[in-house]
From Swiss-Prot:
UniProt modification remark: One or more lysine residues are methylated.
Pfam families linked to this entry: Ribosomal_L11, Ribosomal_L11_N
Gene that produces this protein: rplK
GO BP field: translation
Signal peptide: none
GO cellular component assignments: cytosolic large ribosomal subunit
Keywords noted in UniProt: Methylation, Ribonucleoprotein, Ribosomal protein, RNA-binding, rRNA-binding
HAMAP family linked: Ribosomal_uL11
GO MF entry, a single one: structural constituent of ribosome
Protein name as catalogued: Large ribosomal subunit protein uL11
UniProt lineage: Bacteria, Pseudomonadati, Pseudomonadota, Alphaproteobacteria, Rhodobacterales
Annotated segments matching region Disordered: 83-111
Described function: Forms part of the ribosomal stalk which helps the ribosome interact with GTP-bound translation factors.
Length: 150
């Protein structure tokens, strides 16, 4: 007999840096998920990824307190900012886009870089082909004030 699914949980955790402190610990603990077991499994699965990259994860938890999780690719905005060479700044130490997208640019990327990002994100996007995925990535670039050349 299949396990009974109790629910699912979506989190965004930095690759290789899952630990039992907030926000991961409380989110898992109140659902009865073994926090250390998840942290070890997540860190092992994301060790090949760029350390510190935000990784969306969907955790499905069951009535017997077991769980499964699926990692996705980092957000398009993170990949675009990285490709544009935007440096982390501020108290949260994050790269920022333009304060006035459409009026001023925060950086530039090439069409080739947009294609690479679209190909990497293809499995997570609702696009049928790379061209449609590129249009989605171009929209993200426009909304954070990154100009696309070429």
């Amino acid at each position: 007999m299949a396990k009974k699914v109790v629910g699912s949980l979506k989190l965004q955790i930095k690759a290789g840096q899952a630990n039992p402190s907030p926000p991961v610990g409380p989110a898992l603990g109140q659902r009865g998920i073994n926090i250390m077991e998840f942290c070890k499994a997540f860190n092992a699965k994301t060790q090949e990824m760029e350390q510190g990259a935000p990784v969306p994860v969907v955790i499905t938890y069951y009535a017997d307190k077991s769980f499964t999780f699926e990692t996705k690719t980092p957000p398009a905005s993170f990949l675009l900012k990285k490709a544009a060479g935007l440096k982390p700044q501020g108290k949260r130490n994050r790269a920022k886009g333009s304060e006035k997208p459409g009026r001023q640019t925060a950086g530039t990327v090439t069409a080739k870089q947009v294609r690479e990002i679209a190909e990497a994100k293809m499995k997570d996007l609702s696009a049928n082909d790379v061209e449609a995925a590129m249009q989605i990535i171009l929209g993200s670039a426009r909304s954070i004030g990154i100009e696309v050349k070429g």
